[in-house]
Amino acid sequence: MSFDLLKDINKKVHFIGIGGVSMSGLAAVLLNAGYKVSGSDSKESEITNRLKEEGAKIYIGHSKDNLQDVDVVVYTAAIPSDNPEIIKAKEDNLILMDRAEFLGQIMKGHKFNVAVAGTHGKTTTTSMISHVALSADLDPTILVGGDLDIIHGNFRVGNSEYFITEACEYKQSFLRFFPYVGIILNIDADHLDFYKDINHIKDTFKQFVRLIPNDGYIIGNADDEKVMEVLEVAKCNVLTYGINNGDIQARNIEFNEKGCATFDVFRNEEKLLSLSLNVPGMHNVSNSLSAVCLAEIFNINADSIVSGLSSFGGAHKRFEYKGTKNDITVIDDYAHHPVEIKATLSTAKKMNHNRIVCVFQPHTYTRTKTLFNDFVKCFDDCDELVLMDIYAAREKDLGEINSDQLGDAIRAHGVKCTNVHSHEEALEYVNANLSKGDLLLTVGAGDVVKVGELFLK
């Protein structure tokens, strides 16, 4: 089934799970274009209220009665097949599209589509790029996977040909997109509940590169061997970046006491500009270089690049400062893959703290099982680890893996690690063991953030 943003203006569109990060942005784009939009969600939220104010009809709870006078129904992979609205849509032969397919159709209505892909860093980099595009007055439409202060949420509807979005590889979603510029930040083994192995993942990224038209661009991280291998299939223009390799590089890197970098940006041997970031970590130096690459493609001037990147203070849940209590700093981070955790702890180590006490909640049984050995080795930079039970998310516990097994292996590896089995137990432990000057770092994509929030109360 196809959907044309420009031609199908009379079609009424219903979103199942309209309050979700990805769905709400799509609904907002349609509302701005003049569509009649409805949607359902399990609970009321700031997002559903915002969409209601913009003209959407919002239903709380899922029911077949919600599909009144509807032509198109959009759903996400998280919606089960026995959802009453899915069943009703099939019975009535309505156009039924998943989120990725629908987003791809919306992208067709824009000329300069930017799709930010990679295993790690998509939300942060999409946010950086959005800051630069807004600084340059490109008036872009933006869909980002987290709240971004400058756009007061997770989406912005612009009135130009520029469209900026994250491109998730899970279940090959991004192969439904129509990018003019693709960005690949990195490639690692993840989502192994869907992918067979790293070669399957690389093959999917190669398909993503082949989506880009010959006059388009692929931007890739030259410090990542797997990314460079994938770029070999490109028929479009190729622009690379990196700390140590690539067309665009960072040199003379220095970090301040907050772990934020100042550095010079070179294209080959020509100095383009100097940057001072307000987000910490070497990985964010790398992420910012991809934004510079995009700025080069769209002829954005140096002042707009500097202004955009220096004004970016981070996306929510990405090394987010939560508060300080008794001279103990609390930071929350979304990292849930061993590579991300290592980068987060490396960033924390550059800051001026006494000890780093990390509370980690593994995310999904599949990821914990398939990346077990990597998880064992990724906590070397913390002084103490508090390990919570696995957050199931979309999965069921088959009894194959648990946090106690992971904790035993981490302790055998030489890291001080304590297993806890609830937020209250985690809070009790950190209250008893934190000292002045320590950093409490909550890490994970589930609800581990509650530990830090409870501590600050």
Swiss-Prot record:
ATP binds at residues 118-124. One of its GO terms (cellular component) is cytoplasm. It is found in: Cytoplasm. Belongs to the MurCDEF family. One of its GO terms (biological process) is cell wall organization. It catalyses: UDP-N-acetyl-alpha-D-muramate + L-alanine + ATP = UDP-N-acetyl-alpha-D-muramoyl-L-alanine + ADP + phosphate + H(+). One of its GO terms (molecular function) is ATP binding. It comes from the Bacteria. It is an enzyme of class 6 (ligase). Pathway: Cell wall biogenesis; peptidoglycan biosynthesis. Keywords: ATP-binding, Cell cycle, Cell division, Cell shape, Cell wall biogenesis/degradation, Cytoplasm, Ligase, Nucleotide-binding, Peptidoglycan synthesis. Signal peptide: none annotated. The keyword Thylakoid does not apply. Cell wall formation. PANTHER family: UDP-N-ACETYLMURAMATE--L-ALANINE LIGASE (PTHR43445:SF3), UDP-N-ACETYLMURAMATE--L-ALANINE LIGASE-RELATED (PTHR43445). Its EC number is 6.3.2.8. This is UDP-N-acetylmuramate--L-alanine ligase. It holds the Pfam family Mur_ligase.
